[in-house]
């Protein structure tokens, strides 16, 4: 048969049960000696129809285990059995192994269960030795506390017996007055507490309102921060654009200042008369037997010369008589104002040097326009004195500063040296006129 298993109701440790010869199962204890619990006559009648041979004890065949409650009572003198007044209790095993389930054990189990459920039997819970010691310590502490309270009550009672009736009444009146004062203080404190509760409620409401306002302000702050970031980005972009515009303005002002300091005629037209041939904008005007120049370059040089005189007349406000200058690159020409004739200032070399050709007429007409411009600028006192005089009818350029030599500008019955020298004299006069016009008209136009 397998022994029954019980657990301590406090620490849940298993309790070891010992089965003795001729007696019930007992629990091992260290503090007190366990006693056998007899079954009453009523129980004996319920459990079995015949008396037991051991003088009223439960036989070993019954499947009931007895436990002794640890109290101050000792074992009874009659055969080691415990009297009915002892605080012992029988514990019933509900559900044992199949080998112990006989009709007798089943009947006893049912009866014990009925007594437990009908409150006819007090059920105590088994404890191990350590838990029992702990329980006893707690009970000792409670007993000491109760003894202290009992001593205080006894001392108070003894003191009350020594007090006279008058002193008791005076003390009662004093205590009543103190009680009344304390009741008033309690009422005042109660009112103050109610006021504080009301104030607390108002403060709580204000706090909730402040928290709601704080949340709203935080949302607004976040929204404003996002808007600030957007505006800050736009500001940075605008600052970049402004910086770019300022840089462009600074560059434009510097360019404007440089352009104002730059003379347009000097920057556009460059005339050189130091060599054997006159040169304008790197185009040679004329040719020599030892220096052959193509007619395309000569025509381009004439185009630059026409453009120079045309520009000077425009800025001076001069309207030419008899001819109109038409700058057209290497195919520039003069248009007659009295007729429909056109006098070219370009040639491909096919014109006859023995006849009065249009190319020669065009060069004479150009000298006529140049003479008109010279007469216009001579009205200014600061006009330079030109080194070469123009004879329009003859088509001659006279050197008045040096030898007084006259050179014809025509190719008809003329040599290349004399023709080239006449062209060089003409460019020399234009160079001086260009320098005068650069100073004269630049001061007028500059703010």
UniProtKB/Swiss-Prot annotation:
Location of the protein in the cell: Cytoplasm
Coiled-coil region(s): 169-228
Tissue expression per record: Expressed in brain, skeletal muscle, placenta, thymus and uterus. Expressed at a lower level in liver, testis, stomach, and 17-day-old embryos.
Gene Ontology BP term (one): G protein-coupled receptor catabolic process
Location of the region described as Required for homodimer formation in the Swiss-Prot/TrEMBL record: 186-256
Traits of the deletion mutant: Decreased embryonic viability: embryonic and postnatal survival rates of homozygous mutant mice are markedly lower. Heterozygous knockout mice show defects in autophagy, increased levels of Cnr1 receptor, elevated food intake, and obesity and insulin resistance.
Keywords: Autophagy, Coiled coil, Cytoplasm
Domain of life: Eukaryota
Pfam families linked: APG6, APG6_N
Cited InterPro entries: Atg6/Beclin (IPR007243), Atg6/Beclin_C_sf (IPR038274), Atg6/beclin_CC (IPR041691), Atg6_BARA (IPR040455)
GO MF annotations in UniProt: protein-containing complex binding
Gene3D superfamilies hit by this protein: 6.10.250.3110, Autophagy protein 6/Beclin 1 (1.10.418.40)
Cellular component per GO, a single term: cytoplasm
Function according to Swiss-Prot or TrEMBL: Involved in 2 distinct lysosomal degradation pathways: acts as a regulator of autophagy and as a regulator of G-protein coupled receptors turnover. Regulates degradation in lysosomes of a variety of G-protein coupled receptors via its interaction with GPRASP1/GASP1.
Family: Belongs to the beclin family.
Assembly, per entry: Homodimer (via coiled-coil domain). Interacts (via coiled-coil domain) with ATG14 (via coiled-coil domain); this interaction is tighter than BECN2 self-association. Interacts with AMBRA1, UVRAG and PIK3C3/VPS34; these interactions are not disrupted by starvation. Does not interact with RUBCN. Interacts (via N-terminus) with GPRASP1/GASP1; the interaction is direct.
Protein name, per record: Beclin-2
Protein source organism: Mus musculus
């Amino acid at each position: 048969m397998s022994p029954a298993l019980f657990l301590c109701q406090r620490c849940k440790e298993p309790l070891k049960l010992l089965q003795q010869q001729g007696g019930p199962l007992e629990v091992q204890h260290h503090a007190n000696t366990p006693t056998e619990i007899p079954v009453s006559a009523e129980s004996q009648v319920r459990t079995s129809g015949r008396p037991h041979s051991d003088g009223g004890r439960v036989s070993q065949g019954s499947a009931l285990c007895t436990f002794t409650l640890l109290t101050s009572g000792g074992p009874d003198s009659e055969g080691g059995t415990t009297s009915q007044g002892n605080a012992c209790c029988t514990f019933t095993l509900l559900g044992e192994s199949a080998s112990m389930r006989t009709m007798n054990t089943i009947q006893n189990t049912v009866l014990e269960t009925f007594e437990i459920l009908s409150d006819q039997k007090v059920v105590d819970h088994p404890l191990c030795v350590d838990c029992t010691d702990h329980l006893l310590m707690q009970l000792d502490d409670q007993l000491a506390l109760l003894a202290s309270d009992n001593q205080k009550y006894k001392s108070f009672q003894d003191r009350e017996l020594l007090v006279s009736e008058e002193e008791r009444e005076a003390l009662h009146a004093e205590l009543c007055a103190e009680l009344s004062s304390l009741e008033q203080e309690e009422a005042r404190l109660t009112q103050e507490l109610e006021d504080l509760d009301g104030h607390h409620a108002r403060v709580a409401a204000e706090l909730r309102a402040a928290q709601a306002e704080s949340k709203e302000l935080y949302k607004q702050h976040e929204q404003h921060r996002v808007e600030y970031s957007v505006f800050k980005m736009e500001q940075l972009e605008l600052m970049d654009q402004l910086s770019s515009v300022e840089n462009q303005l600074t560059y434009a002002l510097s360019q404007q200042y440089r352009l104002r300091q730059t003379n347009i005629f000097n920057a556009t037209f460059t005339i050189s008369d130091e060599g054997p041939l006159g040169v304008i904008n790197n185009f040679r005007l004329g040719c020599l037997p030892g220096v052959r120049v193509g007619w395309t370059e000569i025509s381009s040089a004439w185009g630059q010369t026409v453009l120079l005189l045309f520009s000077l007349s425009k800025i001076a406000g001069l309207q030419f008589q008899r001819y109109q200058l038409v700058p057209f690159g290497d195919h520039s020409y003069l248009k007659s104002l009295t007729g429909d004739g056109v006098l070219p200032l370009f040639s491909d070399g096919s014109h006859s040097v023995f006849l009065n050709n249009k190319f020669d007429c065009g060069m004479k007409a150009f000298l006529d326009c140049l003479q008109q411009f010279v007469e216009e600028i001579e009205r200014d006192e600061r006009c330079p004195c030109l080194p070469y005089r123009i004879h329009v009818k003859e088509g001659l350029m006279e050197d008045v500063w040096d030898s007084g030599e006259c050179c014809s500008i025509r190719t008809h019955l003329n040599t290349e040296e004399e023709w080239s020298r006449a062209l060089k004299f003409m460019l020399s006069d234009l160079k001086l006129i260009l320098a005068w016009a650069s100073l004269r008209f630049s001061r007028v136009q500059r703010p």
